[in-house]
Curated annotation (Swiss-Prot):
Endoribonuclease that initiates mRNA decay. The chain crosses the membrane at residues 5-25. It comes from the Bacteria. It is found in: Cell membrane. The gene is rny. SMART domains: HDc (SM00471), KH (SM00322). This is Ribonuclease Y. It comes from Listeria monocytogenes serovar 1/2a (strain ATCC BAA-679 / EGD-e).
Amino acid sequence: MTIAITIISSLLFLIVGLVVGSLIFKSSTEKKLAAARGTAELIVEDAKKEAETTKKEALLEAKEENHRLRTEIENELRGRRTETQKAENRLLQREENLDRKDTSLSKREATLERKEESISKRQQQIEEKESKLAEMIQAEQTELERISALSKEEAKSIILNQVEEELTHDTAIMVKESENRAKEESDKKAKNILSLAIQRCAADHVAETTVSVVTLPNDEMKGRIIGREGRNIRTLETLTGIDLIIDDTPEAVILSGFDPIRREIARIALEKLVQDGRIHPARIEEMVDKARKEVDEHIREVGEQATFEVGIHSIHPDLIKILGRLRYRTSYGQNVLNHSLEVSKLAGILAGELGEDVTLAKRAGLLHDIGKAIDHEIEGSHVEIGVELATKYKENDVVINSIASHHGDTEATSVIAVLVAAADALSAARPGARSETLENYIRRLEKLEEISESYDGVEKSYAIQAGREVRIIVEPDTIDDLSSYRLARDIRKRIEEELDYPGHIKVTVIRETRAVEYAK
């Protein structure tokens, strides 16, 4: 019984619990549903608001896009209308231009037609005149042949000869002008090269004299030099070939002689005798012999020094010694060795400017006057002797030709030979390089003017520039332009044949024509 009550009680409690639980669940579910409905309503409300906002934004964007598109379309349409208007204007302008051109062409066609008619008429008139002119010319030719007794061919030959003479004259003038232009250009280039050479070559020159002075310690030494009955001075003069001048000059003896080597030997020997104090014929002979050996050695050293100075090697020793003798030779007061060194340097510089062999040019310049060292001992000109020496010692053919042609005796066969001749003239002809006696100088000037004035048509001549130029004034009525060139050549040839002079002489012929009228 108890168990049944217990079971019933349990069932009751279970039923009550289920009922209460269902009520609680229902209440909770209703609350959740209410909350869910509220949330759903909020979501729906928010969605509606958002949709409304989105709708407004979309409408706004659509309006803006519509406005932008409308603006673009309007702008495009406006631009197209403008282009269309411009195109229409251009077409109108072209039409107007075409109308004007059409009008102009019509006028031109009318003008051309009128000109063609005029030309046709003129051509017809010209043909008629040509026909008449031909008849007149034929009649004139017939009349001329009758009057002059010349046929047409003979008259034609005379006219052709006259034309040929005129053409020959004009050709000569053109050739002369071309020669003058070529000379001017070559002179400019040559002067440029020579100026560069002169700037790079500087040489000192001292005028050579024919006397030497030996200083004495006192005047008593003069008597000892003279010796008893003059035997000492006679011995010294006999051995050296030099004149001793003993005068009132205090403490000095003058040695006079044209051979510088002998004069140098006498000077050295006398200085040694004065220094030694023992002066008698035997001692004089001994000192002269020593002095001669010293001078020979000095000559060899001078020759070697000259070759070293210009950088020339492999010259024969005998030729070097002969070269050294040029130290004691002069030409118009100019020392020949110094002149040869200067020519060597100038020739080397000129060769360098023209791209020639500088060493060979220097060698030819150094040896160009080698014949002057012994021309007073051997018969022949210094050019001939120089060629013989160069050939004997097997010098280069260019060197031999340079020696032979530097005075124009032989034709130059190389550029170096021409350069050596130019350097020789440049060294010798510059002011102060060479000197002459006053008498010879005046005689040469007078001879220059005499030669110039010996020709017909010469009005007056003047020797200027220390005799290095002669200017001849001619009569314009007697001498024409072409004859003046021939006169200058003739005078130049006579000067070369009849005068001896250093360097060169410029011959200038001046022809002046004046036309004077007086207005009243």
